[in-house]
Amino acid sequence: MEEPLQFGDGGRLFGILTLPSRSHRKAPGLPVFVFLNAGLLHRVGPRRLYVHLARDLSRMGFSSLRVDLAGKGDSPPRPGLTNQQSVAADYDEILRVLESRLARVPLILAGLCSGADNAIRLAPKDSRVVGLVLLDPVCSPDDGFSARAFVSKYTNTARYVAWLKRRFEAPTTQPRGSQEQIDPLTLRDAPTLEQLRDAPLEQLRSAFESIRERDGRVLSVFTQYALQYYNQAGQLARVLGVAGYQQFCTELFWPQAEHTYTLELHRRRLIDAIKTWAGGFIRSRIDVTRNIGTD
């Protein structure tokens, strides 16, 4: 079931609340997914990714809220506030509307690119957040990053094939201007290596440690967009150095997938990965319920 919500001060925020039917409620106390905007994209996500995710998750028993943050989609901007201040104010309104509709519930914050950045900033401050789905979050390079990047650049046969095609093939087709185009750079300015090396890890580490302390879970997925700063599965774990990382974190590296999951194959793979990851919360809640029943 999907319900449009207009909420917040003066009804300035707009979102879609997706609820599972009674037949799909598999475990009590499941966390609610909150999908955060990425850059200029509104609540549907790139190529309706968040819509499909919300509906698939509802069939697993999860509720979710897809919301237009201020200045995106159908929500007007908050004049006089910085982006971080505006996101913080929006988040307070999100918490209030969820509490009024679903009571005080645990949350999973999910976002692509700048949406992941916002989730990382918000998680340590809110004890309700027990899960993070981070799509192409920022990650500092580790000691082996530059060497791996060098080897990959000069051993990538696709690079030479593409050069030969450009060199010898005359253009035979017109650009397909009618197709939907989403420029990843409108979602977040790609950080330089210098910025990444200088960026403190405290905020990112704090987000992961807060989830660990709440017995939660984190899913991080990196695509070809992240090759500018991430090029090997496990790099995030090494950079963070968070105790017990493997026990509560899933880290995936899909260098063939585009940042906005242009191909249906890659979108389906991502949705399946998130559903598999989310299933861990169902198993945990069922175990808790059984333990309570046997006490």
Predicted regions: what is each one?
Residues L30, L36-G45:
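Active-site glycine-rich loops that stabilize anionic/oxyanionic intermediates
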